[in-house]
A protein has these predicted regions:
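Ligand-binding "clamshell"
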Residues: 92-100, 111-118, 223-235
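Extracellular/periplasmic bilobal clamshell ligand-binding domains
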Residues: 288-325
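A structural signal for short loop-to-beta-strand junctions that line the ligand-binding cleft
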Residues: 77-82, 99-130, 147, 157-158
Length: 325
């Protein structure tokens, strides 16, 4: 049967209109704090799947925020997708840098980790776990909860990372004000070894300089373990989870490509790729031993709104009393 000419013309015009926008978006620019060894393969997998080229700029989270905000205020709209720590993502959302997100994979994410405004959504997680040197500490020695580390026998054996006030804030709120504060005052009396940098803390545990770390990212410990280092980790309860977020810039030059990239990262393929590189997926559909336990999610809004309060307390308890290194 012949197709009437007017109907054929209408179909062709509609197809052209639908693909015109996609045809223009043949590249996108990503700002991220994800290490090049992981962000690179993620970008390459997306390019292979879609043919859309990813221009990658990687820096620490503070520099990602600084560049994104500076460019937006100067009305230089260069970035399409931003990916970094949740508190920094919330900071940029408040500057109205992002567009509201919708994704077919939104339902796969833990509801507690998704902000109501959806200007950014979590794509991976950092879990604060207990890591230990397997040559110096037996797994059976470790307490089942953080309360057990108040035992004086752990004095001189435990370490924490220097910037983890959000971990403390989350646990204090979970345990209840006074009880939570009392716990951290007692922990401070044990004078834990304070080190700057989560990667460094994990490396010091593997080297035996710190026997047990209370605020180690499990992905960092897992990475060293896979390389044969004498380190392992345990999800001592309560486990605190800090989301890492991804967003499309409000004035993205390539919005369709940007949204396609976000969907790819959140898809089972993207999340499985993160797992293969030792990262923890945000998706509840992708299970791994790296996320197969209960956890409490850091509230990035609280981190921002109450950061002075918690940073001051953290400084008083753990930093000022610590000898200079």
């Amino acid at each position: 049967m012949r197709t009437p000419l007017p109907a054929l013309l209408l179909f062709l015009c509609t197809a052209c209109l639908c693909t015109a926008g996609l045809a223009q978006d043949r590249s996108l620019t990503l700002y991220t704090s994800l290490a090049p060894t992981e962000s690179g393969p993620l970008a390459q997998a997306f390019e292979k799947k879609t043919g859309i080229k990813v221009e990658l700029w990687r820096a620490i989270s503070e520099k990602v925020v600084q560049r994104a905000i500076t460019e937006a205020r100067a009305r230089r709209f260069a970035v399409d997708v931003v990916e970094t720590n949740a508190p920094e993502m919330e900071m940029m959302a408040r500057e109205k840098l992002f567009a509201e997100l919708d994704s077919p994979y939104l339902a796969d994410l833990p509801a507690a980790a998704v902000p109501k405004h959806r200007m950014w959504i979590p794509d991976r997680m950092n879990f604060f776990v207990v890591a230990y040197n397997t040559a110096k500490v037996r797994r059976e020695e470790l307490p089942k909860s953080y309360l057990g580390f108040l035992d004086p026998k752990w004095k001189g054996r435990i370490g924490i990372e220097a910037t983890d006030a959000e971990w403390m804030a989350t646990l204090v709120k979970k345990w209840g004000g006074e009880a939570g504060l009392a716990h951290f005052r007692k922990l401070a009396e044990l004078r834990p070894d304070v080190r700057k940098g989560h990667v460094l803390l994990a490396e010091l545990i593997a080297a035996g300089e710190v026997q047990v770390g209370l605020t180690v990212y499990n992905a960092n410990a897992e990475s060293l373990k896979r390389k044969g280092a004498p380190i392992d980790w345990l999800p001592v309860q309560p486990v605190v989870a800090r989301p890492q977020g991804i967003a499309v810039a409000r004035n993205a030059p390539n919005p369709k490509a940007a949204r396609a990239f976000v969907d790819f990262v959140l898809s089972p393929q993207g999340q499985e790729l993160l797992v293969s590189m030792g990262r923890v997926p945000a998706s509840t559909k992708v299970r791994t031993h790296l996320n197969d336990f209960e956890y409490t999610v850091v509230d990035p809004i609280t981190v921002l709104d109450e950061q002075d309060k918690w940073n001051k307390l953290w400084e008083e308890l753990f930093i000022r009393a610590e000898p200079k290194r």
